[in-house]
């Protein structure tokens, strides 16, 4: 979870106030907190009572992302552009509407159609996550959600620190 959280902050800085309900953002850029080109993430802002309160995010390793060789692993690469398409934060869906130009630009640079389907599945998973989160927010309210989210993050931080201290 924490590997995705810094990118959410980066996306907020990147788009500023231009993040809307219904947006779906792709990202894999190693120069802006991505870990490798083939690991493409989908980010979906969650708005509750008109405010951005959370994100859902899904990351998957894709079979291809373009580049000099099929599959993305190029042991002879001397620069990142030989490893595949770099995707800085980009809205593929804005305010619930597919940006066909962006969608087609991305997939025109990828060899395998299965990647398009995998990315549709990632969007679906992020959308289901958003729906479920909105159900929880509606049932328990923003205050309880925020308190439990912070408690979960704090517990995770403590466990991670304990594991590192044990090394």
Go through each PLM region and give its residues:
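A glycine- and small-aliphatic-rich helix-loop capping segment at beta-alpha/alpha-beta transitions
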Residues: 1, 43-47, 74
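Gly/Pro-rich turn-and-neighbor structural signature
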Residues: 1-27, 33, 141-167
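Solvent-exposed alpha-helices and their adjacent loops that cap or buttress functional pockets
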Residues: 16-19, 35-37, 49, 79-80, ...
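Gly/Pro-rich active-site capping loops and adjacent beta-alpha segments
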Residues: 52-110
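N-terminal leader/propeptide and maturation segments of large enzyme subunits in energy/redox metabolism
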Residues: 86-166
């Amino acid at each position: 979870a924490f590997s995705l959280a810094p990118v959410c902050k980066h996306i907020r800085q990147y788009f500023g106030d231009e993040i809307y309900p219904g947006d779906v953002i792709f990202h894999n850029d190693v120069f802006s907190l991505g870990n490798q080109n083939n690991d493409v993430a989908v980010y979906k802002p969650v708005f509750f009572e008109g405010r951005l309160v959370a994100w859902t995010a899904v990351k998957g390793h894709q079979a291809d992302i373009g580049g000099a060789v099929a599959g993305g692993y190029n042991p002879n690469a001397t620069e990142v552009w030989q490893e595949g398409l770099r995707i800085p934060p980009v809205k593929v869906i804005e305010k619930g509407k597919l940006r066909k130009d962006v969608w087609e630009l991305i997939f025109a640079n990828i060899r395998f159609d299965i990647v398009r389907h995998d990315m549709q599945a990632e969007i679906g998973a992020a959308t289901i996550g958003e729906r479920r989160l909105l159900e929880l927010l509606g049932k328990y309210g923003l205050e309880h959600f925020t308190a439990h989210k912070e408690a979960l993050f704090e517990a995770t931080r403590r466990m991670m620190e304990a594991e590192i201290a044990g090394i």
